[in-house]
């Protein structure tokens, strides 16, 4: 069982406890996390965007920590409620770095595999079903590397995932055996709180802390 109390956040922010937590991993999208936490004091928000954040899970009755999420902070909202400093933080997996600049490339070798092309573009790529020759020249035109890799995975009949636990850019397509990180089924498993709740919190509204699971 996962509880908000078992989640620890390591970043420039000094988050002492997590109140609410939302994590979503979907095929073809960057993994994302939104959380609300309590702060020891107000941070320098100006330097937070693009900072790394590591989120660990400590399971009930076990002192060992497992990596739940490792990514890049996208937005930070701090506020004070009832005299307590709080933060609402959102972050995306490191794969977001592949999705910032459109590029043009050509791959003319028809015997090159989808996996080989994707590794040339994104580096650490793995998964089933990608070791298939394209059979035709491949063009990347006005696509980010993320968009291109997603299209390449689809060309091989697979869907693309970003590894939520890796501090570096790491992608896989199809099925993959994993170990050493917190385990989640690969296909559309979410640990959520309703996103409207965070808008309510940023407006100073109160609501009982909660956590729920969603399988799509």
Predicted regions and their residues:
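Second-shell loop/turn segments in exported
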Residues: 102-111, 135-139
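Well-ordered beta-strand positions in beta-sheet-rich domains
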Residues: 20, 66-72, 88, 102-104
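Short beta-strand-centered interaction patches in the first periplasmic/extracellular domains
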Residues: 77, 86, 93-95, 130-206
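Short, acidic/charged, Gly/Pro-enriched secondary-structure junctions
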Residues: 1-10, 40-78, 113-124
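Residues forming anionic-ligand binding surfaces in small-molecule and nucleic-acid pockets
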Residues: 89-100, 104, 117-131
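Envelope-exposed proteins and targeting segments
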Residues: 29-31, 67-69, 85-87, 167-169
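Juxtamembrane "anchor/assembly" segments of surface/extracellular structural proteins
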Residues: 1-50, 56, 90-96, 158, ...
């Amino acid at each position: 069982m996962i509880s908000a109390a078992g989640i620890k956040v390591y970043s420039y922010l000094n988050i002492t406890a997590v109140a609410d937590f939302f994590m979503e991993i979907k095929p073809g999208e960057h993994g994302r996390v939104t959380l609300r936490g309590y702060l020891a004091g107000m941070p320098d928000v100006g330097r937070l965007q693009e900072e790394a954040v590591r989120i660990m899970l400590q399971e009930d009755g076990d002192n060992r920590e497992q990596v739940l999420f490792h990514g890049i902070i996208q937005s930070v909202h701090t506020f004070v409620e009832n005299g307590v400093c709080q933060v609402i933080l959102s972050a995306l997996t490191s794969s977001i770095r592949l999705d910032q600049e459109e590029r043009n490339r050509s791959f003319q070798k028809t015997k090159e595999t989808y996996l080989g092309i994707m590794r040339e573009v994104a580096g650490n790529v793995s998964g089933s079903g990608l070791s298939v020759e394209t059979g035709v020249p491949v063009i990347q035109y006005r696509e980010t590397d993320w968009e291109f890799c997603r299209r390449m995975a689809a060309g091989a009949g697979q869907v693309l995932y970003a590894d939520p636990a890796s501090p570096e850019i790491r992608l896989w397509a199809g099925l993959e055996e994993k170990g050493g990180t917190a385990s989640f089924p690969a296909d559309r498993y979410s640990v959520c709180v309703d996103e409207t709740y965070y808008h309510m919190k940023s407006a100073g509204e109160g609501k009982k802390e909660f956590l729920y699971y969603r399988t799509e």
